[in-house]
Amino acid sequence: MAGAKEIRSKIASVQNTQKITKAMEMVAASKMRKSQDRMAASRPYAETMRKVIGHLAHGNLEYKHPYLEDRDVKRVGYLVVSTDRGLCGGLNINLFKKLLAEMKTWTDKGVQCDLAMIGSKGVSFFNSVGGNVVAQVTGMGDNPSLSELIGPVKVMLQAYDEGRLDKLYIVSNKFINTMSQVPTISQLLPLPASDDDDLKHKSWDYLYEPDPKALLDTLLRRYVESQVYQGVVENLASEQAARMVAMKAATDNGGSLIKELQLVYNKARQASITQELTEIVSGAAAV
């Protein structure tokens, strides 16, 4: 059994770590609330854009944009949203496992996969497993802006425009609540069919000014940008929630470990006292 002094040192070490994890839990809780506000502010725009694009996809269009037409799939692209920092439980690895499973489905069919990474954890992971990372952006912090995301989005859209990609997906964690974040893979291009029954049973005719091509080019790009930005802010809220939960679990585990060490310390101290008493009694008997 370890000595009392060694056990006291371990208890002090765990207590210091517990203070750090408790502080990180409180910081993550504060950041999560701000991230939720940012996510809630951006959702109406993203959802409205999705509805408008859904109307266009089911409308009687004068001009059929390439983003609305299916192609034979030879290469697919993924915009992958991960975190820049760790200590957020299984948030990243669960997302990566889901993506790897889908990529395997494509590669088994002879389809190649390109990756545009948002977040340093995704960059390091997919570089280590041999993924084809064609673009990346890292270090966006807790307040990401659309201008920081334009690089990877532009690379993937250009590849799609030039026919080097036949499908484009966004991969991110969807924020459900504090305890639940779901890894999701959503198709961006070509525009997926809507599940809205109203859209399926109605058609819209549009008049375009100045011309449908210019309008659709701009509108569809804004749609992709809005969905990517929404994915980033949802992933950020998921990150802070996962970190808060992970740090709370670490703090609670620290408390349990301290109780166990305290019990071991008490036993060691009791054994030491018993030994001293035995030695005193033995010494007195010898006299």
From Swiss-Prot:
One Pfam family this chain carries? ATP-synt
Which GO cellular component term is one of those annotated? proton-transporting ATP synthase complex
Where is this protein found?
Cell inner membrane
Classify the main location: membrane
What GO biological process terms are annotated to this protein in UniProt? proton motive force-driven ATP synthesis; proton motive force-driven plasma membrane ATP synthesis
Keyword Membrane applies: yes
Q: Which SUPFAM superfamilies match?
A: ATP synthase (F1-ATPase), gamma subunit
Q: GO terms for molecular function, please?
A: ATP binding; proton-transporting ATP synthase activity, rotational mechanism; proton-transporting ATPase activity, rotational mechanism
Q: Per UniProt, what is the membrane topology?
A: Peripheral membrane protein
The signal peptide here is: none
Q: Could you tell me which PROSITE patterns the record lists for this protein?
A: ATPASE_GAMMA (PS00153)
Write down the InterPro entries for this protein, in alphabetical order. ATP_synth_F1_ATPase_gsu, ATP_synth_F1_gsu, ATP_synth_F1_gsu_CS
Q: Phosphoprotein: present as a keyword of the record?
A: no
* Keyword annotations from UniProtKB, A to Z: ATP synthesis, Cell inner membrane, Cell membrane, CF(1), Hydrogen ion transport, Ion transport, Membrane, Transport
Q: What does this protein do?
A: Produces ATP from ADP in the presence of a proton gradient across the membrane. The gamma chain is believed to be important in regulating ATPase activity and the flow of protons through the CF(0) complex.
Family (UniProt): Belongs to the ATPase gamma chain family.
PANTHER family according to UniProt = ATP SYNTHASE GAMMA CHAIN, ATP SYNTHASE SUBUNIT GAMMA, MITOCHONDRIAL
Q: Record's NCBIfam families?
A: ATPsyn_F1gamma, PRK05621.1-1
Q: What is this protein called?
A: ATP synthase gamma chain
Q: Which organism is it from?
A: Escherichia coli (strain K12)
Identify the coding gene.
atpG
